[in-house]
């Protein structure tokens, strides 16, 4: 329904009661209602008088009568002439006859900027040049417009709704009171009575009447009007509408012209192009600033008016255009206030109708209510620019097609969610600005009411503190004089006339630039707001930045929150670095300041994350004994000076000498053109000038100047401060605080507590706004806006743009060019100043760098400085090496023999060798000249000794690795370089022969490390090859290893050497092959198993023979090396996993962790060896524990005293055996003490295709979230570096694949097939790695739509579940088959008849054949599963955006939003939320409710009196212990507890006390008691077996009280606690408990018998000796229960005739249906008092 114009109603009320005019005007102004032209929203000023009304009353009445008659006649004619309602205005009726507009002359229409709001028939015949100038429609009648002269119309920019001639005749004092008239004639509306005005909502004539009668849903479905002007409007060319500045008032005109013919049939009648394109420009250009006050009667007012969803009327011109902003949160305050005074129910319906129509098109289906106009609002400038260059019809068509596609896929991508969330937050904060503006308006209005007039409009100088008051007064003034300020240009000129100083300069610049905002008042206000308004968004961001601290959080969470504030603040990089460091923990800052300061914020973030990782590793390593700790820990703990230019950074604790009530600023003082110092500056209003501490100036080499005359320091009161005058000062230094730049000249004085003091001189200059409560200063003065918010020109460091004398040499080392060019080194090169400001080191006076780099060296050694001194020493060492050559060759065989035959487990070398490389991210490889290249002899001793020497290990550290004789390195060049770099070798340098590798954690630190090495080489006349040197890389190769930040891999050269080994023709050649590959055995899984035939041949005393077995072993070994993975650096702070196995007479183990970036399994090391003769005879249980013990022994450095439990991954069979045998109880006596040093548990090994199983477990562990977010940040910051790594790895893969293809061509027969299989597997590995790279790229933001991702994830989940079910089924079938074989073997031993034996053998053969067939089927299934896994991996697309969404502080956002909602709104939201929870509740919960309500069955009492006599006294009730980790959903535990608490009484047990319930469950006499019933109960018979099955299946166990059923001590079971997963068991037994178990004979009895026999014996003892029942642990189910689960619950018959294992969810659904049927058959019964259930208490004391 269309409402009457509000100003028409007020005008009539003025005629009745003139005195009410002033009251309503003042109310309208205070309510800040905005009005549109013709919609009567603007209120008249409060300054009008009663005399002006009386003078105008008679004249207005006469004119209104004539206009009323003309209006009625025009409406009758229009009604008679209209056929059916064309698509006209829905908001206002036509105000003039339809034929009038057609007769207007062209020259007159060209001057009209606002076309009329009449029907479309008039618009069709308008010429092209008229349409190009159309801006806004006028609402006056066309008949009156024709009578106006042309020269008068040319001056009219926005005519009023009444006739312009009569408005000119009104006196000035009357014009001040005239509100903006409505769309009808002003005279008519004044004379219309109240009852007539009420009927104006639905005019009686014209097509408008028919349109009004259509319902909203019908209007939306109108495809094309049946006749008249609408069809003709479609014929207008599209290019005419491109120049329309403001869309037409008729919504149908604006939309129909833009739509092509085919689009009109499917488009809505009420939607238009302006709702998505045209109107956004006005809102984004500042219409929100005036939205609260109604000063702008144009479309921006309409936008705010309609945005309330029900304010006033919708009959204004152009209102449809702005209705897309009806849900804008910024305007809710204005609309709420508007609703309180000016709205009614009909207007609310009308505005809602228009908003629905306008928002139906060009929006996303998910956000139908209010959210889908926000993106258009934020991106309005882009939309407006696109509209000028694009065909509107095509855009409409594309938008509608996209909308149709999105309806099918309503899910938004994570990027859209993040963008929408950002829009919501920005709009919410923008709404706070409008609230502040509204509060200012209310204050000014109250002041105006008290004083009787508006406050005077003071000029605005640019002070941001006066902005809101100035804008509000301007809008109120323009509201009171609408006829004088009736267009945008006049309003802008009015505002500019009241600007002074900085604000006037800004406006004059816009005028001189001929900016388009001068002609658009909304855009002008927006630009002014951007310049002079201190917005709430910036205020909130600054408060958060000053208060943000890391606290107990991980650095990744802190950095995520910090980075979220950066775009809003826009502070310079150096200021952000200072604030980031200020909020860090003291421990991180301590080590951070010892590293050179990074040159950017991103590098600082990377460095902080690396430091946190190093500190976590350090804390883990400190748990080891001092002799086992790596050297990196000692280096971190060594004292070192701070290298940052940081001063007075107070820690979080209170300083004893500083009063915390002082006001401090974090100030960055640029002490030289290239460096700034962060310092806390004291703001002291008691000091007169600005002062700097004398020590601070000396420490940072600040240039000081002498004053012309000494100056005495005085306070504000004039009292001298100090005894000595000030005679030194600094030059003006650049000081930066946030975005505030200034030049300050400091006076120098001794100030021990404060480095910088800012006094009254600084306060007077900047006039900051000081918040003493929060200790903050903000700068709003015009002086700061003019001078302090523009950064000074940067100082260009010449070293950054310098060109090195040698091409390829980085400029950082340009002063050391002579090290790389020994022949052309001259004086010019040597005299070149160094880049860090230090002098050349060859001069007599050493520089700072030389002192810092060489201070710890021996002075005698460096005094010699000549290489000749070292040559004799090297010659003697070389001679000694020659003498030992023969003896070494003789010993090599015996050393290798000892290593191959040794069966002891020693500490492994390879993982510990690379411990010092942990955290290294930058590498530089130097190639030396003049050094003889060391010849790498591929023997075990020489290779491993070379590794130790290259990494800087000493002889005392070498003894812990191998028991063979140590040999010194024999290379002369090695000894020279090692002697030069001996103190830094292994800290950040690795040296081997000509190759020197420098590695560092950060780029800034790396440059200093390289300089330190180059300085030493220059001092000793050792030169480097520039062509072969690699600077600042992410990967490096040395000693046959490819080193990266993640780990170590064998390089291509070594791989080619191993793969190219020929077939050995003698035992000596075979020894050379084994010498070559044996040192790298830790890179190959099951190395001892693969190389066993070669080792046997080498150690054999028989003649040398090379057969097929040896050839196959050699080829398998080559393939294994080609597939050798990257060995990741072990991280002691992360959880470890052990994979152990026994293969024949060999044991193997692998140390595993999870990759933080991909979540996949990452191997740290492999280990394998043959079993000794004694170990082969170990019992079966000890044999399973043997590889675990070996792994603990080999990797004890990482596994001892770990914080997280070491999870031992076992297969299903071993896991069940070790769980039942009690791993820690069955340990041999000499192993118990050894295992007590380790914190370990056991869990089932995940499926091969499930690469994320370990990652999912780690996600639930404490502290893993921090470890997970840290690499995500590193990925997002260092994308370019990772791209370089991927490119190099891709090249390696391609080379490897080519080599494999060549090898595959050479192989024949089965070997050829094996080679092809391996190649296929490697190709799959390559594809997986490429997929990982693609995943990384997608995590950086280049991912596809979320709909496809989620579909892929659902498919993967389904396939994984099917795969798990099949595997479980196969495992159980395998167990059953194994049991059958054991039974068959026992029968063969017992029976003596040969015939029976033959029959059994035949049966065994048949079984074997069946097993072979089943194995073939299993292999086929495994192949299918592998294919499915490959497809899953192809579809798996991890999203970094989704993971980062978890780090968004939603609690702060939610609290901020809830603070602005009423209690009723919050209550409604909460009720809707819980209604949704109830709707999506688990099906089992619904079934539980049904059982509780309806399954109460009364049972008849037991008639047998003898039971009552024999009944014991009442005891404590039983307790059900719920294990929530075994229940599928989170709410299922509660549902089961309620279900069991209200379950029907057991048949025959309703009169039994709770004491006998346990015996009733498991006792043999329960069926006898059931037979005592005289009559069977009605309904389902819930047998005890059923409830026992239900309890056991859902992890519920019945545990009696201690006093009821005493547990025999000698048969007590070791309690096992389940954590995280059903198959994860942790050990919690003390040493004395283990010894007590052993003393009781439990170990001896269990070790000699099988597990089943042990369990049966224990149960027979329990039931045979006593009537009381001791319950077994949850793992040992009753045989009846197992039979029930196997036959009825867990398996179902599939389509192929095979039994398929059901998942737990399927079983729960089946039980749900069963319980639902049972509840329908059972009758309710009252709950018993004695039998009740209690939930498990959280305390462990009650459980014991």
Curated annotation (Swiss-Prot):
The record's statement on gene disruption is:
Mice suffer from late fetal or neonatal lethality. Mice overexpressing Rtl1 show notable overgrowth and morphological abnormalities of the placenta.
Which residue ranges does UniProt annotate as crossing the membrane? 1473-1493, 1520-1540
Q: How does it sit in the membrane?
A: Multi-pass membrane protein
User: What is one Gene Ontology biological process annotated in the Swiss-Prot or TrEMBL record?
Assistant: gene expression
Q: Does the keyword Ligase apply?
A: no
Coarse class of the primary localization is membrane
Per its UniProt record, what CDD domains does this chain match?
Answer: retropepsin_like
- Give a Pfam family name: DUF4939
Query: Which intervals of the chain are annotated as region Disordered?
Result: 1-416, 823-859, 1287-1439
What is the top-level taxon of the source organism?
Eukaryota
Q: Is this entry keyworded Ribosomal protein? A: no
Per its record, what triggers expression of this gene product?
Down-regulated during time-course of induced adipogenesis in 3T3L1 cells; Lipid accumulation is unchanged during adipocyte differentiation when Rtl1 is overexpressed.
Compartments it resides in = Membrane
Q: In which tissues is it expressed?
A: Expressed in placenta and in various tissues in late-fetal stage.
Compositionally biased spans, kind Polar residues = 31-40, 269-318
Keywords, in A-Z order = Developmental protein, Membrane, Transmembrane, Transmembrane helix
Composition-biased stretches, type Low complexity, lie in 19-30, 41-80, 332-361
For this record, an example GO cellular component is: Z disc
Start-end of Acidic residues biased regions? 385-407, 837-846, 1291-1437
Q: List other remarks.
A: Rtl1 is one of at least 11 genes called Mar or Mart related to long terminal repeat retrotransposons. They do not correspond to functional retrotransposons, but rather to neofunctionalized retrotransposons genes.
Q: What does this protein do?
A: Plays an essential role in capillaries endothelial cells for the maintenance of feto-maternal interface and for development of the placenta.
Q: What is this protein called?
A: Retrotransposon-like protein 1
């Amino acid at each position: 329904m269309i409402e009457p114009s509000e100003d028409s109603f007020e005008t009539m009320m003025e005629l009745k009661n003139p005195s009410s005019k002033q009251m309503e005007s003042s109310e309208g102004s205070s309510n800040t209602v905005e009005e549109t032209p013709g919609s009567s929203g603007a209120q008249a000023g409060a300054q009008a008088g009663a005399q002006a009304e009386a003078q105008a009353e008679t004249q207005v009445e006469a004119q209104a009568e004539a206009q009323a008659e003309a209006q009625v006649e025009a409406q009758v004619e229009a009604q008679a002439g209209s056929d059916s309602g064309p698509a006209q205005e829905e908001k206002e009726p036509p105000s003039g006859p339809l034929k009038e507009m057609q007769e207007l002359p062209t020259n007159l229409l060209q001057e009209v900027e606002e076309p009329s709001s009449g029907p479309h028939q008039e618009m069709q015949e308008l010429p092209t040049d008229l349409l190009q100038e159309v801006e806004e429609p006028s609402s006056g009648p066309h008949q009156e417009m024709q009578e106006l002269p042309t020269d008068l119309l040319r001056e009219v920019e926005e005519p009023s709704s009444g006739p312009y001639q009569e408005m000119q005749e009104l006196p000035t004092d009357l014009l001040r009171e005239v509100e903006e008239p409505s769309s009808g004639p002003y005279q008519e509306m004044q004379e219309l009575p109240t009852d007539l005005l009420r009927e104006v909502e639905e005019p009686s004539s014209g097509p408008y009447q028919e349109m009004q009668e259509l319902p909203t849903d019908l209007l939306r479905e109108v495809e094309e009007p049946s006749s008249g002007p609408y069809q003709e409007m479609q014929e207008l060319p599209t290019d005419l509408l491109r120049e329309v500045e403001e869309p037409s008032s008729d919504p149908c005109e604006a939309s129909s012209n833009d739509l092509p013919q085919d689009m009109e049939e499917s488009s809505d009648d009420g939607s238009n192009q302006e709702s998505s394109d045209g109107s956004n420009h006005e809102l984004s250009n500042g219409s929100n600033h005036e939205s609260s006050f109604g000063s702008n009667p144009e479309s921006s007012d309409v936008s705010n008016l309609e945005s309330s969803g029900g304010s006033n009327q919708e009959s204004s011109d152009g209102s449809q255009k702005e209705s897309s902003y009806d849900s804008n949160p910024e305007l809710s305050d204005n609309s709420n206030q508007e609703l309180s005074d000016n709205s009614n129910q009909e207007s609310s319906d009308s505005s809602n109708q228009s908003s629905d129509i306008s928002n139906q098109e060009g929006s996303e289906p998910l956000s139908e209510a209010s959210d889908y106009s926000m993106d258009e609002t934020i991106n309005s400038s882009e939309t407006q620019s696109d509209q000028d260059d694009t065909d509107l019809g095509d855009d409409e068509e594309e938008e509608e097609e996209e909308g149709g596609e999105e309806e099918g896929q309503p899910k938004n991508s994570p990027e859209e969610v993040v963008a929408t969330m950002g829009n919501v937050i920005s709009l919410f904060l923008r709404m706070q600005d409008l609230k502040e503006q509204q509060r200012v308006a209310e204050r000014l209005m109250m002041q105006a009411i008290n004083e009787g007039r508006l406050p005077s409009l003071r000029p605005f100088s640019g002070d941001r503190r006066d902005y809101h008051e100035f804008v509000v007064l301007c809008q109120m003034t323009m509201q009171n004089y609408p006829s004088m300020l009736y267009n945008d240009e006049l309003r802008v000129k009015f505002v500019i006339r009241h600007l002074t100083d900085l604000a006037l300069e800004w406006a004059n610049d816009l005028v001189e630039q001929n900016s388009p905002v001068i002609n658009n008042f909304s855009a002008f206000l927006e630009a002014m707001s951007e310049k002079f308004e201190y917005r709430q968004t910036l205020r909130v961001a600054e408060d958060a930045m000053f208060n943000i601290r890391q606290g107990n959080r991980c650095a990744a969470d802190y950095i995520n929150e910090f980075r979220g504030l950066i775009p809003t603040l826009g502070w310079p990089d150096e200021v952000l670095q200072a604030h980031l460091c200020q909020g860090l923990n003291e421990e991180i800052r301590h080590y951070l300041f010892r590293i050179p300061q990074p040159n950017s914020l991103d590098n600082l973030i990377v460095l902080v994350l690396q430091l946190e990782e190093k500190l976590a590793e350090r804390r883990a390593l400190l748990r080891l004994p001092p002799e086992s700790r790596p050297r990196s820990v000692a280096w971190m703990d060594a004292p070192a000076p701070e290298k940052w230019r940081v001063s007075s950074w107070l820690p979080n604790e209170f300083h004893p000498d500083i009063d915390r009530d002082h006001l401090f600023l974090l100030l960055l003082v640029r002490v030289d053109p290239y460096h700034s110092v962060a310092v806390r500056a004291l703001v002291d209003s008691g000091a007169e000038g600005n002062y700097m501490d004398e020590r601070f100036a000396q420490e940072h080499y600040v240039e000081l100047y002498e004053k012309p005359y000494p100056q005495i320091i005085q306070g504000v009161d004039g009292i001298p401060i100090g005894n000595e005058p000030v005679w030194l000062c600094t030059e003006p230094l650049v000081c930066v605080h946030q975005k505030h730049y200034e030049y300050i000249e400091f006076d120098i004085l001794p100030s021990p507590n404060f480095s910088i003091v800012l006094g009254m001189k600084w306060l007077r200059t900047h006039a900051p706004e000081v918040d003493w409560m929060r200790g903050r200063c903000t700068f709003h003065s015009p002086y700061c806006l003019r001078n302090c918010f523009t950064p000074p020109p940067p100082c260009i460091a010449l070293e950054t743009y310098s060109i090195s004398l040698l091409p390829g040499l980085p400029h950082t080392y340009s002063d050391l060019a002579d090290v790389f060019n020994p022949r052309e080194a001259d004086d010019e090169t040597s005299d070149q100043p160094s880049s860090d400001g230090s002098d050349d080191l060859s001069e007599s006076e050493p520089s700072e760098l030389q002192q810092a780099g060489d201070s710890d060296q021996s002075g005698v050694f460096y005094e010699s400085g000549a290489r000749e001194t070292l040559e004799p020493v090297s010659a003697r060492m070389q001679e000694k090496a020659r003498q030992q050559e023969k003896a070494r060759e003789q010993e090599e065989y015996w050393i290798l023999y000892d290593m191959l035959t040794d069966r002891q487990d020693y500490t492994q070398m390879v993982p510990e060798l690379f411990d010092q490389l942990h955290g290294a991210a930058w590498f530089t490889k130097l190639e030396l000249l003049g050094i003889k290249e060391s010849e790498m002899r591929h023997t075990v001793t020489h290779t491993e000794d070379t590794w130790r020497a290259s990494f800087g290990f000493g002889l005392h550290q070498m003894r812990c690795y191998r028991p063979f004789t140590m040999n010194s390195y024999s290379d002369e060049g090695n000894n020279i370089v090692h002697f030069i770099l001996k103190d830094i070798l292994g800290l950040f340098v690795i040296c081997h022969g000509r190759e020197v590798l420098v590695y560092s954690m950060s780029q800034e630190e790396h440059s200093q490390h390289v300089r330190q090495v180059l300085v030493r080489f220059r001092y000793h006349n050792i030169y480097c090859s520039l062509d072969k040197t690699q600077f600042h890389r992410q990967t490096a190769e040395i000693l046959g290893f490819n080193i990266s930040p993640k780990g170590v891999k064998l390089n291509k050269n070594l791989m080619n050497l191993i793969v190219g080994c020929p077939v050995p023709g003698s035992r000596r050649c075979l020894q050379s092959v084994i010498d070559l590959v044996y040192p790298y055995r830790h890179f190959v899984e099951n190395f001892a198993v693969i190389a066993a035939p070669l080792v046997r041949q080498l150690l054999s005393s028989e003649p040398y023979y090379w057969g097929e077995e040896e050839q196959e072993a050699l080829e398998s070994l080559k393939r294994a090396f080609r597939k050798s993975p990257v060995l990741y650096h072990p991280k002691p702070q992360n959880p470890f996993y052990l994979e152990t196995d026994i293969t024949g007479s060999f044991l193997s183990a692998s140390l595993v962790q999870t990759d933080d970036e991909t979540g996949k399994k990452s191997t740290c090391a492999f280990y394998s060896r043959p079993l000794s003769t004694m170990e082969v005879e170990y019992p079966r249980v000890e044999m399973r524990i043997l590889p675990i013990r070996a792994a603990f022994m080999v990797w004890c450095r990482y596994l001892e005293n770990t914080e997280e439990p070491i999870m031992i991954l076992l297969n299903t069979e071993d896991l069940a055996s070790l769980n039942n045998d009690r791993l820690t109880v069955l340990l041999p006596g000499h192993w118990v003490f050894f295992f007590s040093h380790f914190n370990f548990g056991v869990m089932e090994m995940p499926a091969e295709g499930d690469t994320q199983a370990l990652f999912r477990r780690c996600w639930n562990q404490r502290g893993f979230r921090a470890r997970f977010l840290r690499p995500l940040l590193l990925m997002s910051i260092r994308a370019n570096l990772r791209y370089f790594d991927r490119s190099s790895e891709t090249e390696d893969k391609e080379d490897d694949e080519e080599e494999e293809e060549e090898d595959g061509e050479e192989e024949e027969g089965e070997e050829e097939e094996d080679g092809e299989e391996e190649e296929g597997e490697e190709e799959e590995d390559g594809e997986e790695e490429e997929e990982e790279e693609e995943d990384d790229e997608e995590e950086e933001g280049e991912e596809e739509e979320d709909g496809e991702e989620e579909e892929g994830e659902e498919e993967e989940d389904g396939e994984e579940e099917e795969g798990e079910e099949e595997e479980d089924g196969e495992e159980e079938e395998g167990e059953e088959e194994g049991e059958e074989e054991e039974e068959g073997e026992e029968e063969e031993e017992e029976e003596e008849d040969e015939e029976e034996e033959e029959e059994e053998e035949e049966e065994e053969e048949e079984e074997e054949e069946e097993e072979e067939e089943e194995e073939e089927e299993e292999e086929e299934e495994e192949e299918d599963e592998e294919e499915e896994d490959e497809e899953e991996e192809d579809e798996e697309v991890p999203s970094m955006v989704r993971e980062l969404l978890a780090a968004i502080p939603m609690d702060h956002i939610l609290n901020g939003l809830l603070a602005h909602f009423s209690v009723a709104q919050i209550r409604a939201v909460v009720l809707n939320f819980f209604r949704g929870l109830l709707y999506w509740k688990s099906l089992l919960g619904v079934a539980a409710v049904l059982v509780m309500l309806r399954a109460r069955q009364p049972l008849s009492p037991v008639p047998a009196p003898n039971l009552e006599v024999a009944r014991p006294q009442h005891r404590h009730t039983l307790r059900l212990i719920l294990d929530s980790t075994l229940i599928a959903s989170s709410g299922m535990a509660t549902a089961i507890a309620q279900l069991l608490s209200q379950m029907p009484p057991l048949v025959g047990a309703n009169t039994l006390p709770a004491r006998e319930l346990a015996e009733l469950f498991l006792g043999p006499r329960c069926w006898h008691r059931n037979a005592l019933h005289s009559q069977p109960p009605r309904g389902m018979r819930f047998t005890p077996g059923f409830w026992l099955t239900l309890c056991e299946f859902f992890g519920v166990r019945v545990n009696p009280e201690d006093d009821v059923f005493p547990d025999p001590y000698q048969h007590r079971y070791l309690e096992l606690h389940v954590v995280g997963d059903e198959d994860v068991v942790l050990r919690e037994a003390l040493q004395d408990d283990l010894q007590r178990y052993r003393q009781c004979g439990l170990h001896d009895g269990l070790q000699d018998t099988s597990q089943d026999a042990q369990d049966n014996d224990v149960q027979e003892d329990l039931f045979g000796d006593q009537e009381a029942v001791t319950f077994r642990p949850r793992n040992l189910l009753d045989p009846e229960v197992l039979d029930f689960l196997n036959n009825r619950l867990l398996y179902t018959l599939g389509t192929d005739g095979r039994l398929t294992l059901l998942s737990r969810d399927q079983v729960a659904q089946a039980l749900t249906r069963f319980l639902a049927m049972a509840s329908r058959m059972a009758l309710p019964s009252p709950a018993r008092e004695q039998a009740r259930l209690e939930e498990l208490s959280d305390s462990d004391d009650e459980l014991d």
